[in-house]
Amino acid sequence: MMKGVIIDLQIVSEDQTNLPTPEQFTQWATAAVRAEALEPEITIRIVDEAESHDLNLTYRGKDRPTNVLSFPFECPEEVELPLLGDLVICRQVVEREAEQQGKPLPAHWAHMVVHGCLHLLGYDHIEDDEAVEMESLETQIMTELGFEDPYSYDEI
């Protein structure tokens, strides 16, 4: 039986109200990697817009903060480490998107963790067929976690 994911939770956001608990982050990440039968270590860093903006500009060339950035750990094949990678989640963007999309805040936090973990596992949504596969898997995982389909909400 899987023990779960080991989470290194770093909260550097000034406002730390309404954040999920460490146990919730672990539950959501574990659900996302369960299909791969992994028990990895993942760093989840909760940041403010300035750090998200800087990282998004540096690594993606996008001049704005974003909800979640995924940085897969690239380990040489001969080295076996359980590190999967890092997720950087922007508190303000997640809160704003949840409100704009009419989603419960915990559901959107869970979705961002699941979405980011799938990126760490190599899933992407650049091409249409990739997006369909990834979104289908996200919906399945979110449903297993007791949340609604994250793509069923309309923007307000």
From Swiss-Prot:
InterPro entries xref list: MetalPrtase_cat_dom_sf_prd (IPR023091), YbeY (IPR002036), YbeY_CS (IPR020549)
Major location (coarse): cytoplasm
Entry-linked Gene3D superfamilies: Metalloproteases ('zincins'), catalytic domain
The EC number(s) this enzyme carries: 3.1.-.-
Binding site for Zn(2+): H115, H119, H125
Source species: Actinobacillus succinogenes (strain ATCC 55618 / DSM 22257 / CCUG 43843 / 130Z)
Protein's recorded name: Endoribonuclease YbeY
GO BP of this protein: rRNA processing
NCBIfam families (UniProt xref): rRNA maturation RNase YbeY
Family: Belongs to the endoribonuclease YbeY family.
Enzyme class: hydrolase
Pfam name, any one: YbeY
GO cellular component: cytoplasm
Entry note: cofactor: Binds 1 zinc ion.
Entry's localization field: Cytoplasm
UniProt GO molecular function: metalloendopeptidase activity; RNA endonuclease activity; zinc ion binding
Necessary cofactors: Zn(2+)
